[in-house]
Amino acid sequence: MNPKKNNNTFLSYFVCLFLLLEVGLGQNQISEIKVGVVLDLNTTFSKICLTSINLALSDFYKDHPNYRTRLALHVRDSMKDTVQASAAALDLIQNEQVSAIIGPIDSMQAKFMIKLANKTQVPTISFSATSPLLTSIKSDYFVRGTIDDSYQVKAIAAIFESFGWRSVVAIYVDNELGEGIMPYLFDALQDVQVDRSVIPSEANDDQILKELYKLMTRQTRVFVVHMASRLASRIFEKATEIGMMEEGYVWLMTNGMTHMMRHIHHGRSLNTIDGVLGVRSHVPKSKGLEDFRLRWKRNFKKENPWLRDDLSIFGLWAYDSTTALAMAVEKTNISSFPYNNASGSSNNMTDLGTLHVSRYGPSLLEALSEIRFNGLAGRFNLIDRQLESPKFEIINFVGNEERIVGFWTPSNGLVNVNSNKTTSFTGERFGPLIWPGKSTIVPKGWEIPTNGKKIKVGVPVKKGFFNFVEVITDPITNITTPKGYAIDIFEAALKKLPYSVIPQYYRFESPDDDYDDLVYKVDNGTLDAVVGDVTITAYRSLYADFTLPYTESGVSMMVPVRDNENKNTWVFLKPWGLDLWVTTACFFVLIGFVVWLFEHRVNTDFRGPPHHQIGTSFWFSFSTMVFAHREKVVSNLARFVVVVWCFVVLVLTQSYTANLTSFLTVQRFQPAAINVKDLIKNGDYVGYQHGAFVKDFLIKEGFNVSKLKPFGSSEECHALLSNGSISAAFDEVAYLRAILSQYCSKYAIVEPTFKTAGFGFAFPRNSPLTGDVSKAILNVTQGDEMQHIENKWFMKQNDCPDPKTALSSNRLSLRSFWGLFLIAGIASFLALLIFVFLFLYENRHTLCDDSEDSIWRKLTSLFRNFDEKDIKSHTFKSSAVHHVSSPMTQYIPSPSTLQIAPRPHSPSQDRAFELRRVSFTPNEERLTTQTIHFEDEESDIECVVEQ
């Protein structure tokens, strides 16, 4: 064998083996990726989370040993300082060139780090910064691996809706953590009055007590607390000391506090939060979670042997966030040199002018956004770079227990703890709900302020109308004592309440008598109520809630009255309007014609010369007005029409008489003006009460501002009206009635009345006193006490006639009676149709004759038939008998009577005559008839012989 050849072969094998080893080593090479961690290392909270982060990496790479990347943690201490946290992040980016940052702990530290991450394109994932304010900072490189605080506000709103609480005080800390949730909470609780109570983040015990004592003086007893858990724990301790954890109070904690409250107490009793409700995100139970808790506890004890604490939800979020970051890094395949070189160089780690930009930041962010897995805290699914909204648990702290009393989900809302059906806490639930003070009764959410606190009631100072409200202030004691109609009703209503309310009155003076500023004081908390002649308006209701009105509502017009005794010459025409007069006259003519039509052939009263028939018809029709007609109606159709018409006439005459009486008596004193449009058209001056909303109302109605004159009292109004300065005074009905109680014979209230809401008492929005006082006002106004109060302040008014007694032009019009005329018209029309049908049927041979006569001749013949007597009518047959004298009379008739009568016209114009002979005997009346016909070309004579 050739030694040289063997050496070459050996060398070739060696080279191949070397290359294979290089390839294998290259394939198994592990890349170390630097990741920064910014925590407050001296806090237990950060130690808990750091243990979870280390365990997350250990578990992840233990489960995936073949992954080519490994996260190398570079931990920095933020020292509970925002500036230090930003400096730590800058150091990690500039000097360590980390690919991502985990942290910081709170939202305040995250605010600057987000901007830094956006500038350097380094993804920053936080598992504990929950403030919604961070979402408003425009940055694509901030990832929230925790729950946004705004997610829970709908669950809180559902609790309020379930219990019906109408007001709440939001107690929050004055930083990004507390302020971030407030806009969302206010929006969710739109139907609830939300007040604020801000606690400084570094508040001492005295500051906390001062704020709590201030809250005790309010009516609201429902509090929502949102702040760091340690500060909240101190607030609950002080609230317990001063008695704010007793029966009647409601305390509700937000998500982060509910999760952390047990950790803050470090195993101590939870008595300071006994009966408190809490909202927290739901963590599904799993075998993996229980296993992790055991391993976490062992590791935490090794790393921190002097601490005793439990795993919190934030530790779980830290674990899941770290796991998600490791998965995204592996998916991105980041190299060891992740940064592009910045222009310039500097050795200063805080030099902002030479910031490096991560090459793999966009890819890592995209990979992180696509990560989906079931984590220890629940489903890890990022939507817009933050965790999706989870299910929330409703927790009730009872002793040392945390009872789950319900759930809330985005899709189903509140869900009973024992079922999947939507429900409320007032229905079936898992165990009783315990409230502060060990009470099982749902608090109503408000109480009258304790410790003898009085409600501050504002009372307006008026220049007139003192019977409504008058304020008297003692110059020595400076004690304000109001009196008047409004004050008496208010105090009577307070006595009807099931609890004691002590009003403390404060006078309010306004140069322009405008009550809007007084209502504003209720809105800003200066006053607890406003009592007086305050009109309820839509604008004022934006700033306060009003009770039910305690006076008659409406704006009306008051004018002087004048005696019209000498101006009533034509007063008899006033009860009816022109349309009613014309319609009635037309119907009189119509009814007269219809009755004549029905009676002409069968009733001798309606026969004779034309002028006699016309006179009889009109006489009969108009005489029905006084039921004085003496003509007998024999036709059934005419009787039907007359009966209907008599009913119409009866109603018309009675209405006319009643209205005429009103015009001759009540309306003898007529108002000087009765129409608003006439006042505007004539340019008359009108008055209004100074400072009242009526001025704006009059301008809206069309009055010129220059034509408006104010008055401040009933005396001023009387002076303006009496001397002619104004033609009318506009004000609310209650004021006008007060004026009439003094001058009832001189003025009158004229319709129409424009609707308003009336006078009411103002309370803060959503105040529970509003509804209770409204109910009390109803009790007062419906009882005898109201009459006593009215007599006390408006005694003379009872002696005046009703000021609204039809002083407007109340003529009766056709609109009031068109139904009657419709009935009469239909009755006449139907009767006329029946008559025409019967007449045409009887004379059908005239119309249907086959002769060559023209239509006109046939109609003429038909008219002649109508004009003749209907011999077949029973009226004429009976008249022939009754015209003969009775046998008991002394009159002896002639032996016989011969009557020749023409028969109805035949189509051939033949004539027939009836010959009658009537004979009598002393003892009986006997009538015989014999018909004899004489026929020729000219006539056909019928001879009737009566024997």
Curated annotation (Swiss-Prot):
Q: Which residues lie on this side of the membrane: Cytoplasmic?
A: 599-607, 629-632, 841-947
Listed under GO biological process in this entry are: calcium ion transport; calcium-mediated signaling; cellular response to amino acid stimulus
Principal cellular location given in the protein's record: membrane
Q: Which UniProt keywords apply?
A: Glycoprotein, Ion channel, Ion transport, Ligand-gated ion channel, Membrane, Receptor, Signal, Transmembrane, Transmembrane helix, Transport
Gene3D superfamilies listed in its UniProt record: 1.10.287.70, 3.40.50.2300, Periplasmic binding protein-like II
Expression by tissue, per the entry, reads: Expressed predominantly in leaves.
Query: Origin, by domain of life?
Result: Eukaryota
Family according to the record: Belongs to the glutamate-gated ion channel (TC 1.A.10.1) family.
Q: Which InterPro entries match?
A: ANF_lig-bd_rcpt (IPR001828), GABAb_receptor_plant_PBP1 (IPR044440), Ionotropic_Glu_rcpt (IPR015683), Iontro_rcpt_C (IPR001320), Iontropic_Glu_rcpt_pln (IPR017103), Peripla_BP_I (IPR028082), Solute-binding_3/MltF_N (IPR001638)
**Where does the record place it?**
Membrane
Q: Does the keyword Signal apply?
A: yes
Q: Does the keyword Transmembrane apply?
A: yes
What is the organism field in this record?
Arabidopsis thaliana (Mouse-ear cress)
| Name by which UniProt lists this protein | Glutamate receptor 2.8
Where are the bilayer-spanning segments?
A: 578-598, 608-628, 633-653, 820-840
Function statement: Glutamate-gated receptor that probably acts as a non-selective cation channel. May be involved in light-signal transduction and calcium homeostasis via the regulation of calcium influx into cells.
